[in-house]
């Protein structure tokens, strides 16, 4: 039950960042930090920075992360910052993933870059 609650709170915080409720999302992130949910905390922080348009800070913070599931978020930062070479390199790394969701993301980003 506790895990399920943590997941729900993380989802609420992410929705909050999308609705510019950054203080509230940060409070949830602090609580999740106390519960040892560091990946969720980092995702909430990245989302908050990105939703405020601070892609450079999000990328800088995210590049310090050890969670591979955050890589697509960093690719989005590179895309928004116009860092074509870094984005291409990241997409090439992500393309080696066996995760079909990552493959879908990579294919979608590559299509986006063609337009």
Curated annotation (Swiss-Prot):
Segments passing through the bilayer: none
Keywords: Cytoplasm, Plasmid, Virulence
Induction (UniProt): At 37 degrees Celsius in the absence of calcium. Belongs to an operon involved in the translocation of Yop proteins across the bacterial membranes or in the specific control of this function.
One Pfam family matching this protein: Type_III_YscG
Subcellular location: Cytoplasm
InterPro entries: T3SS_YscG_PscG, TPR-like_helical_dom_sf
Principal cellular location given in the protein's record: cytoplasm
Lineage: superkingdom: Bacteria
Disruption phenotype annotation: The yscFG double mutant is unable to secrete the Yop proteins upon thermal induction in a Ca(2+)-deprived medium.
Gene Ontology cellular component list: cytoplasm
Alphabetized NCBIfam families for the sequence: type_III_yscG
Assembly, per entry: Component of the heterodimeric YscE-YscG chaperone. The YscE-YscG chaperone forms a stable ternary complex with YscF/SctF.
Family recorded in the similarity comment: Belongs to the YscG family.
Role played: Chaperone of the type III secretion system (T3SS), also called injectisome, which is used to inject bacterial effector proteins into eukaryotic host cells. Along with YscE, prevents premature polymerization of the YscF/SctF needle protein within the cytoplasm. Required for Yop secretion.
Protein's name in the database: Type 3 secretion system chaperone YscG
């Amino acid at each position: 039950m506790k895990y399920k609650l943590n997941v729900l709170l993380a989802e609420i915080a992410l929705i909050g960042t999308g609705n510019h409720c950054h203080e509230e999302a940060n409070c949830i992130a602090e609580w999740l930090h106390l519960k040892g949910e560091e990946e969720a905390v980092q995702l909430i922080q990245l989302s908050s920075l990105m939703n405020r348009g601070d892609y450079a800070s999000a990328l800088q913070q995210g590049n310090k992360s050890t969670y591979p599931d955050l890589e697509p978020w960093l690719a989005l930062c590179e895309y928004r910052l116009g860092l074509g070479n870094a984005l291409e390199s990241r997409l090439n790394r992500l393309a080696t993933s066996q995760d079909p969701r990552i493959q879908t993301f990579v294919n979608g980003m590559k299509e986006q870059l063609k337009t």
